[in-house]
């Protein structure tokens, strides 16, 4: 894995850029969330920043433009993008945790029948992210801007966390979204990346809740440390691509360009980019023959270069 050095000087001036960040509430006691931390950094660099959330910040942040928005509502998100129009930097940061870590494992019954678990996390952590990314891409293409999309994932989307199965699953999914879209959006002058925070002090995980973890030696990060990784992911450069896809060759990997398709793990005071080494290791855990078949399938279906589109003759409601 690649260790990164990121500090405020890593972020260029952002005058003339417009950013949209979801879920940026200030919480009592002076703590702030990851999204708000990213928003403050961009404001300091001269960007115009819109914060989207259900609740307005409890204290004013100079220059921050607040828009009340339920990120789980397609129409509400669409209205915001229609209003702002030209968006250069889009941060899908909204997320919620399991209300009870044991809830998925509990056998809660109603009249003797097992109750369906609360899946509101899927609406916020996955469906809202899918909608946000789609709307951001549409806006960036329509206005022909050089765009960047960054998703707040989680370390639990990289390694298993048995105490939060649904939360972890949603974070695995959004990292999968980055891997899926990175070879497509870049051709539209749009990058997509993610940041996967380990334990971070935020409104969802206040400082007092971190004390037992710190006493056990668990490393934690402040919100502004993670927020800096979000902004870096939107503006950084790279000396090679993460991987070749479809009909691309291995030589294509060596192309310099904008930071794209990458995931930064934040843990304590360290930044680690994980996707490049993960991609390099693929032959080890798939085997050469399997990987060759995967690449062949990608090449056949690579619609960027005239690939075959697979469609089913069955009605959509009959698809497995």
Curated annotation (Swiss-Prot):
Enzyme Commission numbers on file: 1.-.-.-
Family designation: Belongs to the short-chain dehydrogenases/reductases (SDR) family.
Class of the enzyme per the UniProt entry, highest EC level: oxidoreductase
PROSITE patterns, A to Z: ADH_SHORT
Pathway(s) this gene product operates in, as recorded in its UniProt entry: Mycotoxin biosynthesis
Entry annotation: catalytic residues: 167 (proton acceptor), 171 (lowers pka of active site tyr)
Domain of life: Eukaryota
GO molecular-function term, one example from the UniProt record: oxidoreductase activity
Binding-site residues for NADP(+), renumbered to this chain: 32, 34, 55, 70, 93, 134, 167, 171, 202
Function: Short-chain dehydrogenase/reductase; part of the core atranone cluster (CAC) which products are predicted to catalyze most or all steps of mycotoxin atranone synthesis, starting from geranylgeranyl pyrophosphate (GGPP). The initial cyclization of GGPP to dolabellane is probably performed by the terpene cyclase ATR13. The Baeyer-Villiger oxidation near the end of the atranone synthesis, which converts atranones D and E to atranones F and G is predicted to be catalyzed by the monooxygenase ATR8.
Gene name in the database record: ATR7
InterPro entries from the UniProt entry: NAD(P)-bd_dom_sf, Sc_DH/Rdtase_CS, SDR_fam
Protein's recorded name: Short-chain dehydrogenase/reductase ATR7
Gene3D superfamilies: NAD(P)-binding Rossmann-like Domain
Alphabetical keyword list: NADP, Oxidoreductase
């Amino acid at each position: 894995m690649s260790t990164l050095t990121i500090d405020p000087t890593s972020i260029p001036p952002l005058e003339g850029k417009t950013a949209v960040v979801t879920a940026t509430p200030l919480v009592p006691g002076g703590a702030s969330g990851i999204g708000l931390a990213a928003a403050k950094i961009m404001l300091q660099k001269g960007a115009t920043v819109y914060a989207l959330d259900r609740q307005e910040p409890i204290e004013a942040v100079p220059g921050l433009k607040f828009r009340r928005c339920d990120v789980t509502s397609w129409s509400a998100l669409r209205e915001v993008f229609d209003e702002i129009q030209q968006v250069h930097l889009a941060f899908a940061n909204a997320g919620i945790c399991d209300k009870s870590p044991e809830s998925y494992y509990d056998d809660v019954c109603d009249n003797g029948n097992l109750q369906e678990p609360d899946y509101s996390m899927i609406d916020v952590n996955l469906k809202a992210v899918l909608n946000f990314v789609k709307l951001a891409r549409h806006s960036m293409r329509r206005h022909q801007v050089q765009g960047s999309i960054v998703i707040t994932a989680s370390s639990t989307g990289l390694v298993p966390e048995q105490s939060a199965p649904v939360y972890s699953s949603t974070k695995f999914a959004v990292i999968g979204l980055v891997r899926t879209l990175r070879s497509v959006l870049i051709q539209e002058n749009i990058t997509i990346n993610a940041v996967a925070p380990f334990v971070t002090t935020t409104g969802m995980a206040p400082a007092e809740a971190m004390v037992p973890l710190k006493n056990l030696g668990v490393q934690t990060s402040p919100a502004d440390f993670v927020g800096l990784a979000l902004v870096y992911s939107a503006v950084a450069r790279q000396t090679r691509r993460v991987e070749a896809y479809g009909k691309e060759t291995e030589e294509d990997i060596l192309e310099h360009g904008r930071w794209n398709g990458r995931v930064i793990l934040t843990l304590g005071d360290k930044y680690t980019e994980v996707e490049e080494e993960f991609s390099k290791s693929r032959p080890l855990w798939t085997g050469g023959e399997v990987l060759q078949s995967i690449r062949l399938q990608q090449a056949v279906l690579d619609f960027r270069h005239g690939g075959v589109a697979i469609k089913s003759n069955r009605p959509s409601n009959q698809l497995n």
